């Protein structure tokens, strides 16, 4: 009875239009407060605020006019000025003036990641269902996305529609109302299943359905007693693809009523707090009944959102059976009385939001009637939702009626009387009627709800049972937004013969064009042909994935994924049964084949699971997009087909769609994958009625030239939307695809500089149907009962899901494109990313290993990415996982520049590029003596100084040799290099000179089978000492160029060719070389430049210096800033050339105060050692870190740790105990670390224990913990971070992180992890950009930092800084950015639109532009991270470091120097350096590639990073402890490690082969701790 009483109260509440609705758990107030406040109340003011007259302190939303006539030329402009906190998920909605429910918006726009607290947008209002009266009053409301709080409302705006004839609408509505108002029908829903529901951070949801009957939207439809019937399904545990087996739910309703279905998560865990709303549908009953004459059918709808800020993904499928209709004259009121209280009380057997129901309850799904649960929802707008922007909406009614088939009558049909009798009998007690027995055995009682009984507890847990009410409340007015409805998708069993008609019949009837968002939403449904589904699904999915827990068997998942994936404009993978060329679109136009329910859905492979993994949660885009994605293609409504070709599609199972064309191209090729949803919306709006083209295009086959579609496996396999949009002429389609192809080609060409592994180069011909893996993965992982924290911080995945279609990726892999347009690959099983395309699927047993282990053992090269970890000594022939995958990337990259490349095998391409980079021109350009030689050639020097393009090219090549591939045929570069050629010498071996038909000489390199106009007889050797520019080579941190110092090495797949790799130093003995540290030389340069008369000295050899003000400023900058300044300017060609003139003076110069310092011991002239450091304590591996800070840094670091100890940081006596499950690493770390107070984090000792492992934490487990956490937490997979623009191993905060659930807490957690690692002296295997470290230190960024975020933008501003812009650039202090889906102008300073940029104020302009660009979209996230960091560490202590130093403290280095390693290794148990086993050991280590060496290091020490000082300073459990190899064990045993003591126990193996095999096995396969 308690339940019924509560239901009654809620029933009453939802009919009160003045009720205040809770929009999200975060906004929960006490229940009492909820019953008092009107939603449209203006901002409440504090009683103490006496300034009630002025509005300066209040948020405002205003319009440019308050009378608007539809069709007028003048735009309606909405202005906002929000004083409170704003968020990327904020939205503005258009409402009827009397509307109080936030969910009943007629149109809405989301803000997106850019934008500020003030701004304006143009709002287009178009005639539609909501404006069918001569005059109607509306208003706009601004809502905060996270809390749902109303920020501001506009005054009343009157919209006039001169085209409407008075009374026509009213008469029509009234007539129809009278006609049907007395006709009650009974219908049953069965075979319900959902696909691709949104996942939480750590858990799969435990979904259940809430279904109810509500009156239609029009005011002429009365509210009757039967309204409020409610059903709740059983709870399906731990799945994103629930199937309610054999459960039936019957209702009776008027034809004018609507059926509302809401999916919620019965979330009973304590943390983290999440939203339980998973999606909703609002479907007119008439639409369902219209299927009766068509035959058996499966309906599929994309789930919609309640509010624009909701993140929803997936779709719902079910069958409808009309069981009876009541006498036409039966009065609904009379029926209501028969139902009596029953209609108010919910089905007792169904889960209740507030009560735990005993598992034994039988849900009489079929029989009982109950009020609809509150939440169900207003949002589900009926078809006619009004959208102001122009997007194509198709009337589902038409579509469904034509395309769907009704199911044959069921064996048991209940008459209305039976139904009512059953209700009467079961009413309060238990819903089990006869039909109950039909209930699926699959839903076991234990899966039933176990909701907390106390509503206050719910509020505390932020699990708002009212949230549901609210949704429901949204008022039975259901905005008819298509988004919500999602088009209806029919799975027809019938043959495809009549499909064509479906499309033709779809009409754009009364669905007005909706806002771009909506359109994106809608656009998403494509059906796939049943024919290809089975093949694709089978081939791509792992064999027989286990059904999800709670589901009896394979879900009938439409293979629509395939089709929908295309949504985005990708071509459909249709394989016409007729055998017609797939390249041509079906004659029928865009008609899509309905996937046959039995064939495609019940394949057994459970594509749905697959998709669920992919889970397209649109969330990633701004809401509008999210809507689109929410209706994953499954909805076949044209709407979706239409514009939305957007990412909504991305949710597709790419596996199915192996041939998809490129999604990207469908969307704007130039748009970054992570664009705000508005962008996408815009795309949708752009082609309101072009759904056809999208579909048609889908059918066409991807041609080699076109960019393959990046298909995102959306979690929902798109249900095959039966209807397809009308298809434009094939000619038009042809043009579209030609245009796309050319755009893609252009894009590929533009990216010709070698791309990172996955970039546009791939576009050339590969369409990876990646999500197939996802499917497989899901099947596997879900089968185990617990889905690994797949999307810990859950981000709207569609945002980034773009897949190139090539051959299908292995199961559970997906290709995405980042915000810089680069392709990377996502492993959904291990939650990792990599730049290399995965090859063969992993062995089955690998999938059963824990995520963190796999993460270390599989292709995840995130931070140990090729560029960071590969040493120059690494043999090219190594093609293991690390660069085996890279081969393809290389191939793709090369294809951008070499069109012929695609005919070469990968290995050929790779070796050719390698040979090219070892060619004489490259060796000459990167030679340390290059500038010296340049000075000796006056004509070449003159050309170099006068040609800025040439200087730029040479600088780029010296920074990253892979750029040579791009510039090698440049006329200026060729002519320049040929000036140095010695034509008297013979050609190098393997070279030949020939002449073309014009008599021009060219050279053939038979080694690489290439030709060039560059004469290879270049001066590669110099008699001058090699120390000329040692500093330049060492300024670059080989391990983790924190800010991408190596320039764009990210654009190529092979190891970077650093400016001066260690191999270029032909030292007499390795130990000597090891002493050569750049520190001394850099210090010498600074000291030399700090001489009082330095400018006079410099002018003696460089007279032009007096006129070169830029160079003088750089010298002065170094004099002021010291070595940090020198580091920053280390790649400046002019400065380097100037310093090269004074090489001897610099080397011989010793400051007076340093004469006695051991660091300045002179080395013999001619020795490659420029300045050996004789202090043994400071020996360090060559170029391990930026030299400039060596001695200073050591002093700072010692002092820093001393102060930490003095202040009691990490000293105890308490312990910070972390008990971690390896397969729930982030979840456990987040919950435990965020549960400690600031004081505990600072004071207590850290003690980490891995569950099920006996090891004691004498630092080994703690080190591995930080290693593993850093690899997961800072992984772009979760959407919090993204790879920087310059490389593929440093990361930065992603603007799209704003769409990750609970993202502020995640960034705070990230900051705490950084702080804990710092005070406990552990290293993180994570490398960030320089601006990130500056943000941690709260240091302002400058122009040089911008290069790490946007290289081209940096170059533009740099050019502007270096050149006179007088009368050249017409700029003002403004910048354009996208807000609420529109490009708006933002002022960089007050009145900036009227302030021109001049030579005088350009410095300020550059500073403001840099600040805007660096902070864009990440200000709040950065603040949260910094806050978490300083909750652990005192800001004053950390402030002693600069950005580069802080990076060294946090991340150490990872470029392994074997000589340093060997020289700092100890031996025990009879081993010594010359022992045969030890020699074999080091030979094996040398044979390892750098990644394997790092694994060995991680195996023995617990981390792949090493301290900045090198191996001499490795730490153990009680201080520094060197790497040690001890003779131990039988030769049959594997080596074992003691991570707390950095010791490797190595048995005395009898042969090198055995040692190598055993060592490799131990390193690659071992990952747990044991206790001796």
From Swiss-Prot:
Q: How is it modified after translation?
A: Ubiquitinated and degraded during mitotic exit by APC/C-Cdh1.
Task: Give the positions the UniProt entry annotates as the active site.
Answer: 1540
| WW domain location | 807-840, 985-1018
What does it do?
E3 ubiquitin-protein ligase that mediates ubiquitination of TP73. Acts to stabilize TP73 and enhance activation of transcription by TP73. Involved in the regulation of mitotic metaphase/anaphase transition.
A single GO molecular function term of this UniProt record: ubiquitin protein ligase activity
Q: What GO terms fall under cellular component here?
A: cytoplasm; mitotic spindle
The chain's coiled-coil residues are 847-874
Q: Which UniProt keywords apply?
A: Coiled coil, Cytoplasm, Cytoskeleton, Disease variant, Phosphoprotein, Repeat, Transferase, Ubl conjugation, Ubl conjugation pathway
Q: Which residues carry this modification: Phosphoserine?
A: 48, 852, 909, 1175
Per UniProt, residues of the HECT domain are 1237-1572
Basic residues bias spans: 1031-1040
User: What is the name attached to this protein's record?
Assistant: E3 ubiquitin-protein ligase HECW2
């Amino acid at each position: 009875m308690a339940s019924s009483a509560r239901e009654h109260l809620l029933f009453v509440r939802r009919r009160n239009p003045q009720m205040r609705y809770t929009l999200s758990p975060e906004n929960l107030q006490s229940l009492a407060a909820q019953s008092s406040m009107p939603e449209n109340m203006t901002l409440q003011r504090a009683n103490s605020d006496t300034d009630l007259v002025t509005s300066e302190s209040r948020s405002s939303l205003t319009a440019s006019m308050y009378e608007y006539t539809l069709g007028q030329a003048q735009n309606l402009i909405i202005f906002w000025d929000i004083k409170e906190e704003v968020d990327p998920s904020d939205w503005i909605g258009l409402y009827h003036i009397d509307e109080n429910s936030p969910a009943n918006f007629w149109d809405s726009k989301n803000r997106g990641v850019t934008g500020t607290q003030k701004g304006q947008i143009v709002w287009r209002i178009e005639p539609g269902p909501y404006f069918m009266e001569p005059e109607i009053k509306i208003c706009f409301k601004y809502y905060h996305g996270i809390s749902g709080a109303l920020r501001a409302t506009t005054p009343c705006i009157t919209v006039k529609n001169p085209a409407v004839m008075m009374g026509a609408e009213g008469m029509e509505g009234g007539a129809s109302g009278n006609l049907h108002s007395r006709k009650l029908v009974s219908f049953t829903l069965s075979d319900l299943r959902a696909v691709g529901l949104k996942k939480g951070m750590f858990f799969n949801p435990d979904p259940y359905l809430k279904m109810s009957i509500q009156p239609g939207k029009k005011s002429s439809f009365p509210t009757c007693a039967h309204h409020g019937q409610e059903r709740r399904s059983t709870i399906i545990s731990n799945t994103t693809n629930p199937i309610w087996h054999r459960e039936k739910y019957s209702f009776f309703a008027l034809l004018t009523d609507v059926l509302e279905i809401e999916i919620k998560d019965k979330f009973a865990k304590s943390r983290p707090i999440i939203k339980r709303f998973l999606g909703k549908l609002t479907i007119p009953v008439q639409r369902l009944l219209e299927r009766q004459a068509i035959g058996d059918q499966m309906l599929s709808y994309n789930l919609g959102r309640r509010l624009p800020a909701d993140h929803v993904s997936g779709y719902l499928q079910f069958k409808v059976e009309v069981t009876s209709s009541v006498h036409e004259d039966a009065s609904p009121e009379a029926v209501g009385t028969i139902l009596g209280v029953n209609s108010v009380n919910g089905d007792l057997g169904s889960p209740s939001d507030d009560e735990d129901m005993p598992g034994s309850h039988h849900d009489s799904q079929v029989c009982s009637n109950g009020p609809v649960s509150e939440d169900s929802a207003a949002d589900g707008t009926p078809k006619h939702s009004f959208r102001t922007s122009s997007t194509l909406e198709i009337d589902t009614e038409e579509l469904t009626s034509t395309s769907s088939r009704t199911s044959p009558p069921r064996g048991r049909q209940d008459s209305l009387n039976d139904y009512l009798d059953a209700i009467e009998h079961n009413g309060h007690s238990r819903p089990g009627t006869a039909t109950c027995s039909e209930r699926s055995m699959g839903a076991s009682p234990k899966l039933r709800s176990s909701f907390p009984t106390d509503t206050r507890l719910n509020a505390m847990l932020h699990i708002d049972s009212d949230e549901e009410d609210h949704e429901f409340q949204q008022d039975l007015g259901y905005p008819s937004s298509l988004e919500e409805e999602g088009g209806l998708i029919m799975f027809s069993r019938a043959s495809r013969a009549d499909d064509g008609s479906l499309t033709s019949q779809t009409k754009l009837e009364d669905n007005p064009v909706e806002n771009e968002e909506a359109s994106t939403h809608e656009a998403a449904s494509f059906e796939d042909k049943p024919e290809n589904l089975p093949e694709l699904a089978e081939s791509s999915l792992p064999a027989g994935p286990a059904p999800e827990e709670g589901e009896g068997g394979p879900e009938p998942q439409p293979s629509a994924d395939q089709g929908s994936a295309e949504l985005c404009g990708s071509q459909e993978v249709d394989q016409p049964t007729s055998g017609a060329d797939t390249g041509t679109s079906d004659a029928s136009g865009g008609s899509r084949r309905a996937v046959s329910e039995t064939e495609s859905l019940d394949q057994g492979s459970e594509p749905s699971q697959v998709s669920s993994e992919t889970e397209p949660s649109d969330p990633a885009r701004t809401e509008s997009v999210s809507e689109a994605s929410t209706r994953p293609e499954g909805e076949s409504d044209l709407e979706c087909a239409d514009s939305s070709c957007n990412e909504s599609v991305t949710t597709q199972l790419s596996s199915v769609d192996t041939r998809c064309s490129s999604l990207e191209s469908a969307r704007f090729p130039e748009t970054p994958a992570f664009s705000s949803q508005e962008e996408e919306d815009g795309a949708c709006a752009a082609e309101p009625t072009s759904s056809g083209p999208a579909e048609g295009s889908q059918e066409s086959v991807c041609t080699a030239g076109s960019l393959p579609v990046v298909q995102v496996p959306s979690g929902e396999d798109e249900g095959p939307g039966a209807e397809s949009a009308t298809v434009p002429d094939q000619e038009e389609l042809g043009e579209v695809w030609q245009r796309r192809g050319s755009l893609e080609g252009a894009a590929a060409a533009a990216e010709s500089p070698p791309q990172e592994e996955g970039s546009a180069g791939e576009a050339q011909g590969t369409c990876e149907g990646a999500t197939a893996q996802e499917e497989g993965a899901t099947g596997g992982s879900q089968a185990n009962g617990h889905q690994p924290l797949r999307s810990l911080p859950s981000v709207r995945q569609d945002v980034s899901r773009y897949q190139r279609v090539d051959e299908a990726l292995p199961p559970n892999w997906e290709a995405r494109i980042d915000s810089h347009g680069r392709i990377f690959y996502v492993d959904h099983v291990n939650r990792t990313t990599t730049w290399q395309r995965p090859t063969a699927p992993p062995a089955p047993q690998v999938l059963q290993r824990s995520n963190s282990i796999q993460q270390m053992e599989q292709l995840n090269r995130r931070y140990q990415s090729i560029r960071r970890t590969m040493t120059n000594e690494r043999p090219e022939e190594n093609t293991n996982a690390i660069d085996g995958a890279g081969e393809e990337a290389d191939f793709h990259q090369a294809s951008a520049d070499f069109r012929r490349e695609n005919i070469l095998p990968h290995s050929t391409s790779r070796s050719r590029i390698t040979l090219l980079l070892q060619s004489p021109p490259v060796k000459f350009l990167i030679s340390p003596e290059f500038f010296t030689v340049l000075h000796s050639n006056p004509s070449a020097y003159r050309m170099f100084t006068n040609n800025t393009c040439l200087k730029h090219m040479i600088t780029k090549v010296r920074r990253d040799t892979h750029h040579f591939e791009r510039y090698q045929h440049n006329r200026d570069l060729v002519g320049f290099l040929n000036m140095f050629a010695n034509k008297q010498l013979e050609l190098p071996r393997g070279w030949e000179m020939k002449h073309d038909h014009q008599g021009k000489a060219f050279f053939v390199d038979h080694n690489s089978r290439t030709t060039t106009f560059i004469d290879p007889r270049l001066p590669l050797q110099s008699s001058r000492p090699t120390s000329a520019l040692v500093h330049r080579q060492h300024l670059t941190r080989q391990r983790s160029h924190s800010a991408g110092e190596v320039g764009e090495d990210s654009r190529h797949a092979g190891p970077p060719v650093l400016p001066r790799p260690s191999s270029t130093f032909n030292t007499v003995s390795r130990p000597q070389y090891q002493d050569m540290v750049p520190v001394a030389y850099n210090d010498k340069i600074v000291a030399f430049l700090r001489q009082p008369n330095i400018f006079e000295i410099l002018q003696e050899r460089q007279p032009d210096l007096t006129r070169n003000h830029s160079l003088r400023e750089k010298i002065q900058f170094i004099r002021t800033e010291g070595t940090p300044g020198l580091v920053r300017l280390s790649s400046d060609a002019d400065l380097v050339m100037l310093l090269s003139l004074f090489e001897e003076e610099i080397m011989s110069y010793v400051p007076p105060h340093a004469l006695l310092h051991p660091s300045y011991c002179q080395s013999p002239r001619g020795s490659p050692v420029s300045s050996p450091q004789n202090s043994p304590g400071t020996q360090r591996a060559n170029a391990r870190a930026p030299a400039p800070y060596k001695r200073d840094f050591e002093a700072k670091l010692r002092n820093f740790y001393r102060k930490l100890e003095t202040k009691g940081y990490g000293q105890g006596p308490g312990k910070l105990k972390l008990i971690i499950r390896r397969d729930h690493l982030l979840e456990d770390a987040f919950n435990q670390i965020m549960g400690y107070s600031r004081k505990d984090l600072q004071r207590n000792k850290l003690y980490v224990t891995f569950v099920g492992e006996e090891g004691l934490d004498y630092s080994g487990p703690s080190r591995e913990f930080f290693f593993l956490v850093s690899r997961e937490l800072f992984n772009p997979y979760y959407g919090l971070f993204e790879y920087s623009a310059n490389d593929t191993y440093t990361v930065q905060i992603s603007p799209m992180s704003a769409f990750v659930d609970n993202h502020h807490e995640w960034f705070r957690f990230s900051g705490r992890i950084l702080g804990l690692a710092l005070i406990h002296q552990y290293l993180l295997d994570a490398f960030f950009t320089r601006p990130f470290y500056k943000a941690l230190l709260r240091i302002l960024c400058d122009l040089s930092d911008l290069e790490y975020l946007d290289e081209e933008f940096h170059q533009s501003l740099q050019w502007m800084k270096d050149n006179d812009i007088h009368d050249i650039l017409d700029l003002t202090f403004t910048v354009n950015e996208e807000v609420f889906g529109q490009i708006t102008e933002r002022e960089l300073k007050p009145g900036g639109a009227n302030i021109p940029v001049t030579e005088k104020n350009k410095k300020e302009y550059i500073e403001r532009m840099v600040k805007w660009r660096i902070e864009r979209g990440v200000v709040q996230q950065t603040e949260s991270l910094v806050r978490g960091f300083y909750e652990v560490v005192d800001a004053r202590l950390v402030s002693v470091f600069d950005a580069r130093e802080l990076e060294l403290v946090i991340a150490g280095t990872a470029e392994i120097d074997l000589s340093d390693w060997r020289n700092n290794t100890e031996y025990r148990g009879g081993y010594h350096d010359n022992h045969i086993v030890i020699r074999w050991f080091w030979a094996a280590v040398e044979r390892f590639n750098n990644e394997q060496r790092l694994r060995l290091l991680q195996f023995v020490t617990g981390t792949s990073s090493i301290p900045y000082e090198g191996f001499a300073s490795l730490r153990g459990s009680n201080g520094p402890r060197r790497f040690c190899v001890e003779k131990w064990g039988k030769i049959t045993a594997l080596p074992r490690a003691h991570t707390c003591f950095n010791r490797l126990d190595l048995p005395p193996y009898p042969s090198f082969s055995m040692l190598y095999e055993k060592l490799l096995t131990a390193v690659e396969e071992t990952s747990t701790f044991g206790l001796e």
